[in-house]
UniProtKB/Swiss-Prot annotation:
SUPFAM superfamilies: FtsH protease domain-like (SSF140990), P-loop containing nucleoside triphosphate hydrolases (SSF52540). The keyword Kinase does not apply. It is found in: Plastid, Chloroplast thylakoid membrane. This is ATP-dependent zinc metalloprotease FTSH 7, chloroplastic. The chain crosses the membrane at residues 134-154, 268-288. Probable ATP-dependent zinc metallopeptidase. GO terms for molecular function: ATP binding; ATP hydrolysis activity; ATP-dependent peptidase activity; metalloendopeptidase activity; zinc ion binding. Its cofactor is Zn(2+). Its EC number is 3.4.24.-. It comes from Arabidopsis thaliana (Mouse-ear cress).
Length: 802
């Protein structure tokens, strides 16, 4: 025999549970468990989630019956009795009897004592006080709020009673008159009733209609018009204000038998006060039950995405799901994160080998390399809750909010464990606490960081929560956050190489379903975009499509990609701004000087790229001219000393051309070239160790006495002596490069003038026309000596004096 019963919602009063289907037992026990459970016969037709099926043989079934009594100090005291039922196969032979628990069984007696002790105070659990209200605060708040609203509406709908004893539901009109009118009516014995409240006087005439007919002309014009509008009303009450230096004519009113006094208080004062108190209690109960956050960036707004749900893995509410198939060019970083997702999907594969999941993974890389995209891919691939937020959401004006939000975030993640937390731009709250990267003290950020450290690997840490962090400033993070146990892995997301750039271009082209022309080779475009990040390449594809659409093309051609690359490097050509006169000639010779010197360097050094395009059209980036030298066809990770010196000479070729052509009358057009050359020369001397006088040392480390993370000035320990030497060597190197550039320009005067004149006329020179001029460039001996690193031979006087 099988019995199925379904538990219903519990009630506040006492209850009992039963496990039998005998009809006789049901009739006897229905008075105490009818509200608690519903009994079904054999082979039930339906089941519910909380139903239980019990096989019943020839045995006894014991049913507990709870008698509860509430005491204000002790809570609910329970008295238990047991109902013993003999269940057999035949329903007709079943019998039942009710008896108290046997006192002969020692284990049963001790069990009853323990249950009685535990149930005496029903809200005491494990020596911890836990108040469990009988009626939820939500119900109380809703009830009181509804009652308050109803009574408030009734109060508004109840008619006013301006004078005691007047008839209810009669429309009353108040007419304001001067105090002199009131005195006149009192003296003429026309006033029937007066109420005095300080200086406010309300009075009623003995015969309103007669007075209105006879005395209308004596009132003011405004009062007369008002009386005519209220002529049909049953009652008119006049109001006036007594001047402070005039007494109320009580003696005259007594003589005329006028009923007067102060206004009576309306009934219901206690009721109104109670109503207001109930309203505030309802509001308070609602706020306690449903706390309201006045911050727009609270952790309650953190987005939870679950794979497989309606919003599973979505980057935004209406966005599309990102998976690892959409990530290219960062294979190493993707492999690290795929392993974490695989661990969450199939933990037995690693647990049997003794492995544990990493507590945290820190994604480090330049802006645009794809750190957030990788996190979105994890959200799309993981079959666990994924909670994302920004570190800037933790810290606000109020002290303690940051730490509280961190606790709420991890509490939510632990509740849904296993889960993943992604904190973007984590350096906003995780800067080092030693003062090196802090301009001032910020206790709120430090409290937030301390709470984050505790949650990740503290006393109550939870390995079921994995934290992903993203930053492009890993050097400023606190060492306690970067240690193993918190961020076990530091994944560097680097700029993609040529193969990676080509893969990224293919992903974006296929994702946008971009129709490409026959002349488009994504491999050659990848070679043109050395140093581009994933975000740069995505923008490049979009810009190429926009340029093709602007020209009403059906396909995106190679020229569109080339123009998009130029826009990314130098900006957009200005159509309205054009150079004229002497400025146009100077800029043309300046760009021709870059081309001549760059070609001479490429003739000496094998494998160096050559100039492909010259332009003197102003661009939005601020450049008046543009010399395009494409990067090498293969990715380079090292820069040799001769290549570095050759780039220095090329950068100063424009300034050298201006000095030669205009006999020393130079312009400010070379300011960007000088800035870039100075930066390159400083790194060669102070960081790369390419200067013979200073030697192969790191100037910053040497001047500080070793690697020092205290945040002190790098020049503080030698009183600036080393920086003076570095400045002197940088100046000598730049001057030597300029002298060599002057030698190259003087060795090619015809090419400089001819190419400059043609560029001034056409504003843009490229292709075979440009290569015809550059094929005539020769490299002087001074250039060969300089790129070999023997610049001291070119300046013997300066070398000897130094």
């Amino acid at each position: 025999m099988t019995t199925t019963f379904e538990f219903l919602q519990p009630r506040i009063h006492g209850f009992a549970t039963c496990c039998s289907s005998n009809s006789l037992l049901y009739s006897k026990a229905s008075r105490f468990f009818n509200d608690r459970c519903r009994v079904y016969r054999q082979n039930p037709n339906r089941f519910v989630s909380n139903s239980i099926t019990l096989p019943l043989q020839k045995k006894q079934v014991t049913v507990l019956r709870n008698h509860e009594r509430f005491n204000l100090w002790d809570g609910f005291s329970r008295k238990k009795s047991r109902l013993v039922v003999n269940c057999q196969e035949d329903d007709q032979n079943e019998s039942s009897s009710e008896e108290e628990e046997s006192s002969q069984s020692t284990p049963a007696k001790s069990e009853r004592k323990r249950e009685k002790k535990e149930d005496k105070v029903w809200w005491s659990k494990g020596k911890k006080w836990q108040w469990q209200p009988i009626i939820q605060a939500q119900g109380i708040g809703v009830l009181l709020l509804q009652l308050s609203v109803v009574m408030f509406v009734m109060r508004l709908l109840r008619p006013g009673i301006p004078l005691p004893g007047s008839e209810p539901r009669i429309q009353t009109t108040f007419v304001s008159v001067p105090y002199s009118e009131f005195l006149s009516k009192v003296n003429s014995n026309q006033v029937q009733k007066v109420e005095v409240d300080g200086v406010q006087v309300l009075f009623k005439l003995r015969d309103d209609g007669k007075w209105q007919e006879s005395e209308t002309s004596r009132l003011s014009q405004s009062s007369e018009s008002l009386l005519r509008t209220v002529a049909p009303t049953k009652r008119v009450v006049y109001s006036t204000t007594r001047p402070g230096d005039i007494k109320t004519p009580y003696e005259k009113m007594l003589g005329n038998n006028v009923e007067f006094g102060s206004p009576e208080k309306r009934s219901g004062g206690f009721f109104n006060s109670a109503l207001i108190a109930l309203f505030y209690i309802a509001v308070l109960a609602g706020l306690i039950r449903f706390p309201v956050s006045f911050s727009t960036s609270s952790t309650g707004q953190l987005r939870t995405r679950k794979a497989g749900g309606p919003d599973g893995g979505k980057v935004s509410g209406g966005g599309e799901t990102i998976t690892f198939a959409d990530v290219a060019g960062v294979d190493e970083a993707k492999e690290e994160l795929e392993e974490i997702v695989e661990f969450l999907r199939n933990p037995e594969k690693y647990v049997r080998l003794g492995a544990r999941p990493p507590r945290g993974v820190l994604l480090v890389g330049l802006p645009g390399t794809g750190k957030t995209l990788l996190a979105k891919a994890v959200a799309g691939e993981a079959e666990v809750p994924f909670i994302s937020c920004s570190a800037s959401e933790f810290v606000e004006l109020y002290v303690g909010m940051g730490a509280s939000r961190v606790r709420d975030l991890f509490a939510r993640a632990k509740k849904e464990a296993p889960s993943i937390i992604f904190i973007d731009e984590i350096d906003a709250v995780a800067k080092s606490r030693d003062g090196k990267f802090r301009m001032g003290s910020n206790d709120e950020r430090e409290q937030t960081l301390n709470q984050l450290l505790t949650e990740m690997d503290g006393f109550d840490s939870n390995s079921a929560v994995i934290v992903l962090g993203a930053t492009n400033r890993a050097d400023v993070l606190d060492p306690a956050l970067r240690r193993p146990g918190r961020f076990d892995r530091v994944v560097t997301v680097e700029t993609p190489d040529k193969i990676g750039r080509e893969s990224i271009l293919r992903v974006h082209v296929s994702k946008k379903e971009l129709p490409l022309g026959d002349d488009v080779n994504l491999g050659s475009i990848a070679s043109m975009t050395t140093g581009f990040t994933g975000a740069d390449l995505a923008n490049l594809v979009n810009e190429a499509a926009l340029l093709a659409g602007r020209k009403n093309k059906t396909n995106v051609e190679k020229i569109d990609f080339i123009q998009a690359v130029e826009r990314s490097i130098a900006g957009i050509e200005k159509k309205s701004a054009r150079l004229k006169g002497n400025e146009k000639a100077v800029v043309a010779r300046h760009e021709a000087g870059h081309a001549v010197v760059g070609t001479a360097v490429a003739n000496l050094l094998t494998g160096q790229p050559r100039v492909e395009k010259l332009s003197i059209l102003p661009r939005t980036g601020g450049a008046l001219g543009f010399t395009y030298i494409p990067p090498t066809s293969e990715d380079r990770y090292l820069l040799f000393i001769d290549e570095l010196l050759g780039r220095l000479v090329t950068l100063l070729g424009g300034r050298a051309a201006e000095e030669v052509v205009y006999s020393g009358r130079i312009s400010t057009g070379a300011f960007d070239d000088i800035r870039r050359a100075t930066d390159m020369a400083y790194k060669a001397v102070a960081e790369y160790g390419l200067n013979q006088k200073i030697g192969p040392v790191s100037v910053a480390t040497l001047s500080g006495g070793g690697i020092d993370d205290s945040g002190g000035s790098p020049w503080g320990r030698d009183q600036g002596k080393l920086v003076d030497l570095v400045q002197k060597e940088v100046t000598i190197l730049l001057q030597s490069a300029l002298d060599v550039a002057l030698s190259v320009v003087r060795a090619n005067p015809d090419v400089l003038e001819g190419l400059g004149a043609q560029l001034e006329e056409k504003e843009k020179v490229e292709g075979e026309e440009l290569q015809k001029w550059l094929s005539m460039v020769v490299a002087p001996e001074e250039l060969a000596v300089f790129v070999e690193g023997k610049q001291e031979l070119l300046l013997p006087a300066q070398a000897s004096s130094s």
